[in-house]
């Protein structure tokens, strides 16, 4: 690292401390959703392989959760793999699944966070399913940030699965279709989502400059605030995180009003 890079790093850290010092902690979001985008483009820009980009993105996750732990954030949802990602070439998908499995095991072994899977288990390899179940069991007692790992996740699929779960639940209880139709409301459907009784995201961060949701938590983000960051996920810094919190705190949430 040359002198210019060292000086730039020092200035960024000083600026981050200044931003952090002016944060209103009463306005920190309780639930943050993250669309971690840009691993492949970061790798291409740095002359690295796609797999290296995914590994760099995976390594950023613990650092990010550490920043969240320094605030009053209570829930973080990380979108690690979408249902659409299964259409990627096998030479990319297979290593990516291995990297994600390593992430799950690392988060569970860390001991600071409670891990919960959101997504469709049926799409995942048996080894990944085992890792997720073991992570949930091993961290169920932890009184730290609840980390939703969205793996094999699609927003429309989640809603379809919620409706299916609701119908099956009614069938098990002997509820007629007529009675179910009369009793269905927003809260009932919400209870059958992957996130169940969790609070909806207050803030959704998407990296890489893309300004779209791509189906992320379609039901839960009806009143969420969004923050789009130009930085690719592997290059996401604490100062970028603090800027997102500052931007969120400055907004006036209307909840449709």
Residue ranges and their predicted role:
Residues 1-257:
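Flexible, compositionally biased loop and terminal segments
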